[in-house]
Structure formats: structure tokens, C-alpha cells
Amino acid sequence: MRTPITTHSLLLLLLLQQLLQPVQLQEVDTDFDSPDDEMEELEEYLEEFQSTGPTRPPTKENVERRVIIEPGMPLYDRDYCNEEIKRKNVYHKYRCVTEHYFLLMQYDELQKICYNRFVPCKNGVRKCNRSKGLVEGVYCNLTEAFEIPRCKYKSFYRRGYVLITCAWQNEIHKLIPHTINDLVEPPKHRSFLNEDGVFVIPP
């Protein structure tokens, strides 16, 4: 009578092993996935890429990834924009962006500009915030609009005052950079400050 019980026990153990095996494999696979931040970045990119609604509000991570650059590739390199825009996935849905700025500075320094005084800026935007000091960066201007990622840009090295717009982020209760409006090189013989101490862009 003991033999059937032993046989059934072995069969049950084998069945349990088969049932548990996929769960174990799934757990092992998860350990080899990309880091959480990379997966989140991919999900954000795909959501923005496929979205038909308005552009999502900026986040610190988004600005850091798309705007802030580290020392490395020479800023004077004529292919700088072509390489960096492709590497950082700087696109607007299915289209190439018409212009973009890369800034050689820390994000915290950029965020502090949001609390500087308002100044006029380009493209009809009334209020921008200006950096107090000069910043190095690269201005990218679209020259040939192919299907992404084959966008072609002309790169311009600049060292000037950063003009940005900012937006309030409820999650962190802070102003954060929204768009880089311009990187204005100072004129050689004229000041950007008028008699009242207001920053103005000369014609």
C-alpha cells in the first residue's frame, strides 16, 4: 500500500517543480534587466513619442538628460549637434526639433536661474530668466529634416548669457527650467544692462 503513496508524492513534487519553474525563471530574468532609471527613461520616451496630446511638462531628469552636457567632445566640433541629439534622443514625437541648446553647466546652477529677474527674450516670449554669468554651450540649428533619427544640424559654439523659461512643478514645489530660449553672446562694446539695471538685448 505504501508504493502508490510514494509514487503520488513524487508526481506531486514533479508537478510543483514544473509549476514553480516559470516563476523562478522570471525572477532571474528581472535581475538582468536594465536599471530602473533606464527603463523609466525608455517608457517616458515611448509615451512622449507615441502621444497625440500636448507635450508632457518637463522634469528635472528630462532637462538633465536633454540639455546638460559634460566635458568631453569638443564644443567646437561641427558634428556636435548631430552626435548629441541622436545620442540623447532629442526629438519631438515623430519630428526633428528645429533648434536645440546644449549647456555645459550643472543642473542646480541652471535651476537657480529660474529665480533671477525677468528679461525680454526672443520669439515673442515676454518673460525669460537670464543667467548672471556667462555659460558655454552649443546651439543646434536644423538644416535638413529627414525622418528621425537622420536629422542634420549645424552646430554653433557659444559663450553667453542663458535665457530660459521656467515652470512650477507641484511634486517638488519648485520652479524648474522649461525651455532654453537663447544663449546670447555679449557684444564687445555694449552692456546688456541699461541705466535702470534691466537686461536688454541690443538690436
UniProtKB/Swiss-Prot annotation:
Identify one Gene Ontology CC term for this UniProt entry: extracellular region
Q: Which CDD domains match?
A: RNase_A
Q: Signal peptide span per the entry?
A: 1-25
Q: Which UniProt keywords apply?
A: Disulfide bond, Glycoprotein, Secreted, Signal
Annotated InterPro entries = RNaseA, RNaseA-like_dom_sf, RNaseA_domain
Biological process, per Gene Ontology:
defense response to Gram-positive bacterium
Top-level taxon of the source organism: Eukaryota
Give a GO molecular function annotation for the protein.
nucleic acid binding
The cysteines covalently paired via disulfide bonds are: 96-151, 114-166, 121-128
Where does the UniProt entry place glycosylation sites?
129, 141
Q: Which Pfam families match?
A: RnaseA (PF00074)
Q: Where in the cell is it found?
A: Secreted
In the record, the note on similarity to other proteins reads: Belongs to the pancreatic ribonuclease family.
User: What's this chain's function?
Assistant: Does not exhibit any ribonuclease activity.
Please identify the protein, giving its name as recorded. Answer: Inactive ribonuclease-like protein 9
Q: Which organism does this sequence originate in? A: Macaca assamensis (Assam macaque)
